Amino acid sequence: MSFVVVIPARYASTRLPGKPLADIHGKPMVQHVVEKALQSGADRVIVATDDERVQQALAACAGQAGFEVCMTSKDHQSGTERLAEVCRHYGFAADTIVVNVQGDEPLIPPVIIRQVADNLAAATAPMATLSVPIQDAEEVFNPNAVKVVTDQEGYALYFSRASIPWDRDRFAASREQIGDHYQRHIGIYAYRAGFIQRYVDWAPSALEQIEALEQLRVLWYGEKIHVAQALEAPPVGVDTQADLDKVRALLAN
C-alpha cells in the first residue's frame, strides 16, 4: 500500500519563532520529523514550507536523504490548506493517500504514521486519525486535551475540548476517578487527496469555530473520520521552549 507524507513547516510560530529550524543535536527539528516519516515506509515525503530559510536549510540533504521540499503560500490559515496546495502542485490522483504529519513532532513513532495510512486504506471514510487512552483524571478536564468518541465501528461521533462522554453517575460522586472510556485525539491525519480540496472549499462550520477544532468541519458536512487507538503513544510535541528542552533531553538519552 503506497502513501505520501506531507509535513507542513510554518516558520512564523507565535510561541517559538523559527520552530522548524530549532536545533536538536545538530539537526533542524523538521529534519528529525522527516527521518521518522521516511522510516514509516512512505513512498514520498514532502516538507511544505512558507519560508525560504526552511527550504535552504533542507536543500543540502533533501536529495540525498530522499525527500522533497515544496514552497507554499504564506497566506494559508491552516495546515490543511497548505496540504491542499501541495496536492494541487504535484497533481496527486484523487485516491492517493496523504498523511499529514506535524512539523513539530520530532519524536513521532514511524509505526503510527504507517498505521493511520493503512487504516484509511481499509476504511469507508475519506479521512482517518488516531487516539490514545486517557488514564489521568486531570487530562479528562483539560481543554487542551482533545477528546474523541466513536461509534462501534470506530468512526468519530464527535471531537471536543469538553469532557466527553460525561460520566454522570461517577462524576456526581467524584471527579478524581475516571472510567476506561476516554480517548485523547492525536493530531495526525490521513486523507484521500481528492477529499482535501473538497474540505478546504467548504465554509468553516459553527462547531469548529466554537471548539477551535478544524476536524469538526468534516463531521458537520456529513463525512466520516475513522479513529483507531494508536499502536504507540507519541511523546511530547514542541510548542514552547520548555517542550524543545524536553525533547533535546530525551534524544540525548
From Swiss-Prot:
It catalyses: 3-deoxy-alpha-D-manno-oct-2-ulosonate + CTP = CMP-3-deoxy-beta-D-manno-octulosonate + diphosphate. One of its GO terms (cellular component) is cytosol. One of its GO terms (molecular function) is 3-deoxy-manno-octulosonate cytidylyltransferase activity. It is found in: Cytoplasm. Keywords: Cytoplasm, Lipopolysaccharide biosynthesis, Nucleotidyltransferase, Transferase. Pathway: Nucleotide-sugar biosynthesis; CMP-3-deoxy-D-manno-octulosonate biosynthesis; CMP-3-deoxy-D-manno-octulosonate from 3-deoxy-D-manno-octulosonate and CTP: step 1/1; Bacterial outer membrane biogenesis; lipopolysaccharide biosynthesis. InterPro entries: Cytidylyl_trans, KdsB, Nucleotide-diphossugar_trans. Its EC number is 2.7.7.38. GO terms for biological process: CMP-keto-3-deoxy-D-manno-octulosonic acid biosynthetic process; lipopolysaccharide biosynthetic process. It is an enzyme of class 2 (transferase). NCBIfam families: kdsB, PRK05450.1-3, PRK05450.1-5, PRK13368.1. HAMAP family: KdsB. Activates KDO (a required 8-carbon sugar) for incorporation into bacterial lipopolysaccharide in Gram-negative bacteria. Belongs to the KdsB family. This is 3-deoxy-manno-octulosonate cytidylyltransferase.
